[in-house]
């Protein structure tokens, strides 16, 4: 569970992929990007959304992490399914809530978009998970992979936080470079101050 200690350098190697995804999101004209997840898979993106807000030209990032029918209905009423990107996030791929969210919103999107519904969905999951298989079967636009050695609550600097960050228009490379400064400032080579 200590994979987060080195994640910044690993994710910086993928900065161009996140930038390309961000450009694609912008070009699609999505008005909303909705993270469907629970716990650590949704907490990091929620903090990013609350901290940075909506960026011009990019979708508003929203989080659905409650199965309460009123919250699901309220979220659905606030979006245009034809202009929404869904980010289904589950490390294990077997967490009940994200799977229920995926099934519900995919069915709703198919009613509006038909066979193009998968183009409005991306998955963030660990390699080999049930979510990976479901995303492939449902023709999701893209699957991003997390790191099995990182627990959900430490995953904001992995794909679980960076995919939503890119979708909302944040410069992921800059975010990671700033995180690297802090990582290096707290590293084992830094002498303690007395």
Language-model features, listed with the residues they occupy:
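Glycine-rich phosphate-binding loops that contact phosphosugars or nucleotide phosphates
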Residues: 23-187
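Cofactor-/ligand-binding subdomain signature composed of acidic, glycine-rich
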Residues: 1-31
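C-terminal and late-domain segments of enzyme folds
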Residues: 191-194
């Amino acid at each position: 569970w200590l994979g987060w200690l080195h994640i910044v350098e690993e994710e910086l190697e993928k900065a161009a992929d996140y930038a390309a995804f961000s450009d694609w999101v912008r070009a699609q004209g999505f008005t909303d990007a909705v993270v469907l997840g629970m716990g650590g898979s949704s907490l990091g993106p929620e903090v990013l959304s609350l901290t940075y807000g909506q960026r011009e030209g990019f979708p508003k990032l929203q989080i659905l992490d409650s199965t309460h029918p009123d919250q699901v209905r309220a979220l659905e009423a606030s979006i245009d399914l034809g202009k929404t990107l869904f980010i289904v996030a589950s490390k294990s791929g077997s967490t009940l809530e994200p799977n229920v969210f995926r099934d519900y919103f995919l069915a709703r999107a198919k009613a509006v978009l038909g066979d193009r519904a998968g183009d409005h969905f991306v998955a963030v999951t660990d390699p080999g998970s049930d979510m990976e298989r479901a995303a492939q079967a449902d023709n999701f636009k893209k699957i991003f992979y997390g790191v099995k050695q990182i627990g959900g609550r430490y995953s904001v600097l992995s794909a679980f936080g960076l995919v939503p960050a890119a979708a909302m228009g944040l410069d992921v490379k800059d975010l990671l470079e700033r995180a690297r400064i802090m990582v290096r400032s707290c590293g084992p080579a830094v002498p303690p101050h007395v």
